[in-house]
Amino acid sequence: MEAPVTPYIWQYQPETGTAAGARQNYGAVINWLSSDNNMYHRVQEVNRQRNKIDDFREQTVRADMAHSFNDWKPQQLSQPASTAYLPAPNPIAGPRTIPDVIFTAEGEQLAGASPSLLSGGASLPPSSYRLGDGREYRKFTRDAMPFPHNWLVKENGVWVPVEERDPLLSEEGRNALSSYPTLTYAQPPILRYRRLGQQLQGGGVVAPSSRVVSLLTEQPRMPRTEGMTPYQFSAEFPPVVYDHPFSRNLTLFPKEFSPLFDPKDQVLATSLATLQYR
């Protein structure tokens, strides 16, 4: 008795860090057909678009989310436990687990000063920050704009806007993706665009418009040219099987079902109908 067909499983090549396909006898089950990772990710994107409707409806009826990120309390914007970036710990809450100052290729992180103590043991948020240049900085608005937007520097006991007093950290030195200062001295792009981890950016308002964008995480913006790790392989090349791929008109049959499909070699436009298989 012939064994039933199994999913088309991509094989990981540890020597080269690439994926290779496995041959299967799909004649055993005529309504089964597998796909490469290109089709898999396209189907996943369709599912995400479908879920956006319910996700948006849920957000608009929740009182704690139906407003701007700028109105959230600091406790609501804490980093998830699995993120690589950890904020500087509160010296009053307990022993330090990481340094308060993290040095990067772009200068020192704004780690923050010690909170002000109040009667009864309460504390206030840090009133100012230090860059390591002997001056104090503070932000006078609660927004997610990058440094030095809406930042003040203390000079001779007076708080003045950074953009007016320090051209080095002004228009030519700001970084649109980070709240950290960017120095203007020459450095390789791989260092200039390196990030410590996830950050909350953007306006973040929940509105019935697809033009509202909030950057909650940062990922590499350059295509991967080198090999991948076994973890990346397991996340990007899962076993995939599609049921009844021939249930529609064959003129809409997607080339992505073929393990040999390469988008660069496909000259015909792909319509939305090719993604509507059940």
UniProtKB/Swiss-Prot annotation:
The gene is L4. The record marks A113, S114, Q199, L200 as: Cleavage. All late proteins expressed from the major late promoter are produced by alternative splicing and alternative polyadenylation of the same gene giving rise to non-overlapping ORFs. A leader sequence is present in the N-terminus of all these mRNAs and is recognized by the viral shutoff protein to provide expression although conventional translation via ribosome scanning from the cap has been shut off in the host cell. Belongs to the adenoviridae hexon-linking protein family. It holds the Pfam family Adeno_PVIII. Residues 114-199 form a propeptide. The lineage of its organism: Viruses, Varidnaviria, Bamfordvirae, Preplasmiviricota, Tectiliviricetes. This is Pre-hexon-linking protein VIII. It comes from Snake adenovirus serotype 1 (SnAdV-1). Interacts with the peripentonal hexons as well as the hexons in the facets. Part of a complex composed of the core-capsid bridging protein, the endosome lysis protein VI and the hexon-linking protein VIII; these interactions bridge the virus core to the capsid. Induction: Expressed in the late phase of the viral replicative cycle. Cleaved by the viral protease during virion maturation. May cause the middle segment to be shed from the capsid. One of its GO terms (molecular function) is hexon binding. GO terms for cellular component: host cell nucleus; viral capsid. Keywords: Capsid protein, Host nucleus, Late protein, Phosphoprotein, Virion.
